[in-house]
């Protein structure tokens, strides 16, 4: 029987550890503060922002939220980011994506100080990851590493296949697996023999953005499957990139959707906020 990797439980454990750490920091006069900026009122973005606020409140991290109107200009947003960069009370700055179409997302990400880039999206953070320097790691890939480690799954020497090459998941995921001594293959829409490559994987990370794309023909017996996808099926139920019911009996471990990778993203964001406060206080 395969191990169902419980992201809810593991993320809860991490939040408890952070709660204790924040309490000890407060006793030393060190506070942790996350500022979230949302432009417009996209309902999904509002849910994500609310979840971040709740996690902050639980752990003891102060959260500030700027809810800016849709018509906010690029210059106005950059001016706010510049002000927050200079505010020593603020440890982490996060602009909820996507931003409205009239804005330049790349310029916005680059405007955030790398010292406060708790999303891990700044080019300096990405460069630090590839060279092994200290920096903030994108939250979803960092969460996946924690899922594997805390489930007793070794990455060292394993054949790891990442399907998807996005800047948020695929690319940083491949770098993190490499850092853990995995032998990494990254696949994408131009990969010719996708099924054959996936069948070789000891650890398969599915981040292709297509519901139930991966069935049992893509995985070998005893593989570990990490499902990053999140979709709604025709019955309006959540599902991932992996057809869970077809794959579960063939693999040694798998993340469900929901309750797998998703909860880890916010837990690792909170971890990055605490890390930012420690660095700002030379700890």
Predicted regions, residues:
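Positively charged, low-complexity intrinsically disordered leader regions
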Residues: 1-30
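Short glycine-rich, flexible loops that bind phosphorylated cofactors or substrates
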Residues: 101-102, 212-214, 233-234
